[in-house]
Amino acid sequence: MEKKHIYLFCSAGMSTSLLVSKMRAQAEKYEVPVIIEAFPETLAGEKGQNADVVLLGPQIAYMLPEIQRLLPNKPVEVIDSLLYGKVDGLGVLKAAVAAIKKAAAN
């Protein structure tokens, strides 16, 4: 299976770095073929074009409509604040994979 790209965006690109590390560890553990990267929200329009799913940190949830407009053919979702706060790599990975599958079914 081709690797899917999961891109996380937050206000500076730094607050998601620990979450990305945990997601990568879970993806490796469960052999989920994904590439997971984090970027600042200012790069969402540019970098998001290459993503299979775009995840926004809860602190930029207000930007959801704007980023959906920039990336009309991509699934764009806000990371659940409880999962984000707990730095739950597996939970966020599962949500991202579900969003990719949902988009593929449509």
Curated annotation (Swiss-Prot):
Induction line: By GlcNAc2, GlcNAc3 and beta-N,N'-diacetylchitobiose (Me-TCB).
Query: SUPFAM superfamilies per the record?
Result: PTS system IIB component-like
Pfam families recorded for this chain?
A: PTS_IIB
For this chain's UniProt record, which GO biological process terms are given? N,N'-diacetylchitobiose import; phosphoenolpyruvate-dependent sugar phosphotransferase system
Q: Which GO terms describe its cellular component?
A: cytosol; transmembrane transporter complex
Tell me what reaction this enzyme catalyses. N,N'-diacetylchitobiose(out) + N(pros)-phospho-L-histidyl-[protein] = diacetylchitobiose-6'-phosphate(in) + L-histidyl-[protein]
Location in the cell = Cytoplasm
Domain (PTS EIIB type-3): residue spans on this chain: 3-106
Asked whether the UniProt record includes tRNA-binding among its keywords, one would answer no
The entry lists its GO molecular-function terms as: kinase activity; protein-N(PI)-phosphohistidine-sugar phosphotransferase activity; protein-phosphocysteine-N,N'-diacetylchitobiose phosphotransferase system transporter activity; protein-phosphocysteine-sugar phosphotransferase activity
Under InterPro entries, the record lists: PTS_EIIB-like_sf (IPR036095), PTS_EIIB_2/3 (IPR003501), PTS_EIIB_3 (IPR013012), PTS_sugar-specific_EIIB (IPR051819)
Task: State the EC number(s).
Answer: 2.7.1.196
Keywords annotated in UniProt: Cytoplasm, Kinase, Phosphoprotein, Phosphotransferase system, Sugar transport, Transferase, Transport
| Residues with the Phosphocysteine modification | 10
* Active site residues per record: 10
Subunit annotation: Forms a complex with ChbA (EIIA). ChbB is a monomer in both its unphosphorylated and phosphorylated forms.
Q: Which PANTHER family match?
A: PTS SYSTEM N,N'-DIACETYLCHITOBIOSE-SPECIFIC EIIB COMPONENT
Q: What does the entry's free-text domain comment contain? A: The PTS EIIB type-3 domain is phosphorylated by phospho-EIIA on a cysteinyl residue. Then, it transfers the phosphoryl group to the sugar substrate concomitantly with the sugar uptake processed by the PTS EIIC type-3 domain.
Question: What does this protein do, in the record's words?
Answer: The phosphoenolpyruvate-dependent sugar phosphotransferase system (sugar PTS), a major carbohydrate active transport system, catalyzes the phosphorylation of incoming sugar substrates concomitantly with their translocation across the cell membrane. The enzyme II ChbABC PTS system is involved in the transport of the chitin disaccharide N,N'-diacetylchitobiose (GlcNAc2). Also able to use N,N',N''-triacetyl chitotriose (GlcNAc3).
Name used for this protein in its record:
PTS system N,N'-diacetylchitobiose-specific EIIB component
Organism of derivation: Escherichia coli (strain K12)
Name the gene that codes for it: chbB
